Amino acid sequence: VAYTRSQLGLPVLLASQTLAQPKTAPHELPETKLDALVHLAGESLMGLWTAQKRERIWKSRVEMTQGLVRHLGTWKAENRPRVLVCASGAGFYGNRGDDLLDEASPSGAGFLAELCVEWEKAAKEAERLGMRVVMLRTGMVLGPDGGAFPLLKRVFGFGLGGRLGSGRQWMPWIHVEDAARLILRAVEQDSIRGPINLTAPEAVTNAIFTQSLAKALHRPAFFHAPIFAMRLLLRGMADEMLLGSQRVNPRVATDSGYTFTHPSLAGAFASLLGA
C-alpha cells in the first residue's frame, strides 16, 4: 500500500508497533491527522497450532484490534482517520466445499472462522467513532518476495510439488499487485464499507493450482500429500488452512468497477516468474 500510494505521489506514514495496549502506540500517531489507517498486523499462521500458538494468533488480531480502536477513541476527532481498513481472511467462510461464496455469505465453523468473526467485530467498533470500516477477507497472496510463493517456487522447482489431499478443495488467491490496489481502492472509495473479498475472480481447486504452477515452472508434479499424514504432522492447521475449501467470489471489488490486473492464475504465475 505504501508503495502504491508513493507511486501516486501521496504521503504515507508507516507505523510498526504493538498496539494491544494504547500506551505503546507510536507517538507520531496522536499528533498526526491521518486520512486512513490500514491495519494488517498479526502473528503468522504458519507453524504448528499449539495452544500457545493459537493464543498468539488470537491476541495479535482480535485483542490488538480492540486496543487499536480504544486508542483511536482517545484521539481528537479531527485527527482520527476517516477510514479504518483492517485485515481479515477468507477463512471467515470456513470449509464450504463447492459453495460459491461472496461477502454476503455467512461465516463458517472452525478456529479461523471464529477468529475472523471476532476480528471483524473488533474493527467495526471504529464505526462508533465516526469512521468508515472495511474488512479485507484475503486469500493467499502471491508475491515474489513474501508469503507462500517463494517456498512453493522452490519446492515445485525441484520437482517435488503435488496436490494436497484430494486436491478438490478450492483455494482463494490474489496477486500482490491486485491486493495492494484493492486496499488503496478501499481507502479512497467511500462506497466500499464492510467486508471485501481480496481474491482473484478465477477460483481454482488445489489440483488446478498445482498443475498450473508445475506447468509454469516446466516441472512435473507427481507427488501427493495424504490427508492422514498432513493431519498427523500439522493437526488443526491442516484441516483449516490446507484442506479447507473456500470458493470465493470478489463481488464487492467487481461491483465497485475494479478491473483485476492479474485475473487468471496462469497470468499471475507468468508475472511472478518474469515470463
Which residues does each predicted region cover?
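C-terminal amphipathic/interface module of NAD(P)-dependent oxidoreductases
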Residues: 239-275
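Alpha-helical substrate-binding/gating segment
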Residues: 124, 153-161, 169-204
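Glycine-rich "substrate-gating" loop/helix at the edge of Rossmann-like oxidoreductase active sites
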Residues: 107-111, 139-146, 166-176
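Conserved Rossmann-fold NAD(P)-dependent oxidoreductase catalytic core, especially the SDR/UDP-sugar
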Residues: 66-110
